[in-house]
């Protein structure tokens, strides 16, 4: 008898496993210092120092219609935007915090505009939401693996009401699922150490997600990240195991299968250069040829590719990124039949490339 979680996962991901190619967009306050999205953690930056970027954020050239047209031209079938990253800054008008785009000089609900623009182009839409929040006072500070203040003795012995934080987190997710229309993907990030599964009250959370938007496809990072994928690879996955596995910056050598050897949905999330968020001096871009080869390899192994771009502080996707994506789109215009709706061909890999097969 088929496991109900697996059965529902298969039904939900039918469109997703045909789409194959998506756009990831990491954008937030960290685009202002322009040293990557982990700048606050990497530099142990105090909240007060980071706040100056909040006061500067105007996103004057943000035009999501241009982003959406670029994604369509590149042949991307879905797109995911960081509604909130680890720094806790919301690109939408959350009623649970003042740390949001509508309170910056920008004064815009950037998520709402993104969703409308991409829907208008016929592109499926998703939102990334960080389970981690370095802004919230009740998220663990001292001794945490990643928090900017993890080594700051001032926070040693500080009591944090983690249940209060979880209430805040769940409320914000409920906002996104309630106030922003039909979402195709919710991309949670991430679990680490003992911060996984029921530490996030994942059963309660997933019940809410499925009640509000039963169709929405979610990743596996409520339970595991990276090599610790969680129970999605087993024959008895938890209800919060996710609908797809999410290897980062790599392609699994043989794709991803469960314990019985059955293919499970997966998506390689890969950056176009070496950072997710905008980095002014990162010019290590992948060529369009390499992007195409990466996409073909993913599809040949029954997986998706979500390729990341990091807009600058004004809301502009770097020109180099635009040029690469347009070139990839030219290839897909001629060869998309070998990508969309295709997967593992059940044939040995040839010396000259890869096989894909259209799903019947």
Walk through the language-model features, giving the residues of each.
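Mature catalytic domains of secreted/periplasmic carbohydrate-active enzymes
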Residues: 1-360
